[in-house]
Amino acid sequence: DTKGVHNFIYAISPQMDAVYGNTRDRLLFRWPGDEWVDFIGMDCYHGLNTEAFTSNLRTLSALSQEKLKPCGVTETGQESFEKADYWTGCILAPLMGQRVSMVVMWRNKYVARNESDRHFYSVYPGHVSADDFNIMYGRSRSLFSGDLPDMYTMAEHVTVR
């Protein structure tokens, strides 16, 4: 604000990995005030515990509606998972009925042919969950970057000052 820059989105995104009795309080623990927060997120490395993900999503969605702020899962995933229905069972199912604008999976590390590192949080060709990912991808509830309109080409006859 001091330099007159106003094209930032300020987000708060606490770690929420388990089922908590005070989920709302945990989401608001470091809340700086409504005037400072544009986006409410949570990092949720819930593993295969869909109860934790569902519970935290429910509270996140309710808080989002109360505060009139968009919300989403800013980081999630299960390292080196081998669950065939991970995408529809552990990610998509808990999201159903929640007003969550985005879910971001943690990274997949590049592994050269001679490495045996299993550091991945998302699908890759040939993974046991690849077919399930394609099912999730095809559902009307999911939206991927390829589904979005071109937002980065300046419209004709528009001048930015």
Give the positions of each predicted feature:
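A structural motif corresponding to the C-terminal end of an alpha-helix
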Residues: 1-8, 33, 63-68, 147-157
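Substrate-binding cleft of secreted/luminal carbohydrate-active enzymes
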Residues: 69-161
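Aromatic- and acid-rich polysaccharide-binding/catalytic face
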Residues: 26-51, 106
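Substrate-binding surface in catalytic domains of secreted glycosidases
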Residues: 42-63, 67-69, 81
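Alpha-helical scaffolding within the catalytic cores
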Residues: 14-32, 51-63, 85-94
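Aromatic-lined carbohydrate-recognition surfaces of secreted/lumenal glycan-active proteins
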Residues: 1-25, 69-82, 105
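Glycine-enriched alpha-helix->loop->beta-strand junction motifs that scaffold or abut catalytic
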Residues: 35-39, 68, 99
